[in-house]
């Protein structure tokens, strides 16, 4: 993974940190995410270790550490469009009491009020969207999504761009369990 790719992921992750707790109650629909706030004096990311398709990273945000695992898709559809930088991240922010928060990040603005679907071995998870990112719609399903990632073989992410283009991404789940284990003790 290139330095530019990692730096882009960090910038997006840092900018979206204020959205981390913007989870939607299932019965009432998605809540409006809070205004994103960039952390003060965030240091660049440090790669802890690479585990096949997934890297484990950390950076300092204020007085606390943020740890995350990150992967890029193995395929992007449709192949004829510029997708920009695409990532799937699972972050852990102990200073904010956030543990294993999955997030899809894309290089384009997603269609407003659209849903992103994550499919792992035929099990679907729904994410709500805001600008160039998506989070699990029902926070209570985050542990199930992470557990499915640890034991699954294949993961795909389907989205709709602001222009109405249907996009999909395939990810390898090789190394995700080891990468998550590596950030387990993030403090």
Segments and roles (model prediction):
Residues 2-4, 22-187:
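A generic "folded-domain core" signal
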Residues 1-23:
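Sec-dependent N-terminal signal peptides
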